[in-house]
Swiss-Prot record:
Provenance organism: Pestalotiopsis microspora
Listed Pfam families: Tubulin, Tubulin_C
Protein name per Swiss-Prot or TrEMBL: Tubulin beta chain
Assembly mode: Dimer of alpha and beta chains. A typical microtubule is a hollow water-filled tube with an outer diameter of 25 nm and an inner diameter of 15 nM. Alpha-beta heterodimers associate head-to-tail to form protofilaments running lengthwise along the microtubule wall with the beta-tubulin subunit facing the microtubule plus end conferring a structural polarity. Microtubules usually have 13 protofilaments but different protofilament numbers can be found in some organisms and specialized cells.
CDD domains on file: beta_tubulin
GO molecular function, one term: GTPase activity
Amino acid sequence: MREIVHLQTGQCGNQIGAAFWQTISGEHGLDSNGVYNGTSELQLERMSVYFNEASGNKYVPRAVLVDLEPGTMDAVRAGPFGQLFRPDNFVFGQSGAGNNWAKGHYTEGAELVDQVLDVVRREAEACDCLQGFQITHSLGGGTGAGMGTLLISKIREEFPDRMMATFSVVPSPKVSDTVVEPYNATLSVHQLVENSDETFCIDNEALYDICMRTLKLSNPSYGDLNHLVSAVMSGVTTCLRFPGQLNSDLRKLAVNMVPFPRLHFFMVGFAPLTSRGAHSFRAVTVPELTQQMFDPKNMMAASDFRNGRYLTCSAIFRGKVSMKEVEDQMRNVQNKNSSYFVEWIPNNVQTALCSIPPRGLKMSSTFVGNSTAIQELFKRIGEQFTAMFRRKAFLHWYTGEGMDEMEFTEAESNMNDLVSEYQQYQDAGVDEEEEEYEEEPLPEDE
């Protein structure tokens, strides 16, 4: 079986991770102690992708929980699914990174990283045929951003041929937790561009919007936001966890989604977005799902794909769906909105089907898009970064941990390069290349 090892780092990562495990335990018929009491053979068939089987019909998540302070871990352990995880897989420090990327990446985090790698190695050795790693973290803080990216690069060194998928919570434009978010995020993106294979960008503000606009929650809690993220994570990994007609895995997703190795930052969406209690009142159809899935309001990152073009995108449908209907709808979307898809990648929409819907729904769909509009997100962080870096504001927190200003400059220019690469492919057309070919034979006439 193709196993995935899951890492969660920092406060944000651990809370999203906990929500994710809660969601998929439910889908696989496990209770909060990991004991199987499901009804369907299909739940067991690929259980081993995320769970190790222990004695007595108990399943243990293949998860490594990392933080530089004990607080969040204790909360996870005390939470409803705290008894699910293997106690040895909690790795935590005492000091905290204090939202300082340098602490997470170079000082505090670097002291803890070998301990984490031992646990990762142990989990990897228990695998039959390891497919890759997934990591949940935020890019604005210290531990998730700094230590998360450190772990990614260390794992990359040790397992160079395995997939690395990250679910990264990007700082949002209006909702900010700390003043140094732009620094931490820029330094993290600098690492992710090089070391991750696929990064799913999630953004608190977009999640807030979805909760308020679509789910009509007047003051959403982080629990509600994490519930949305876990729905997407569960959707992206459905194909790996259940048999289906058209399966895809992390590597297939990457092959279909990443036209150029650096451009692997995806927007994600989920449909049907209904509040937790309302879904039982109406039937969902494939056309509705498709329409909702391609709706900018459903995107979990604060950038509007109407300002860019899709290089590629992938739709994962779950439930009793007719293959033909899905194909027709997807073709329909591409024909109607052809201006939003680049024309030099034919067939750039990939679909996958899985016959088992999420709990409480008849059918659902998860959307993953590689759109050039994601550059808005990097531009925004870049502008905030420049505004502070120009004045060298707050830099002493980083240089004090042994960082160099050069590193900041490098990270900044790497992110600017990323933005201009996206822009370049957004503007590229088919006709430009044809002109080049016509001009080539000219010198022979002389």
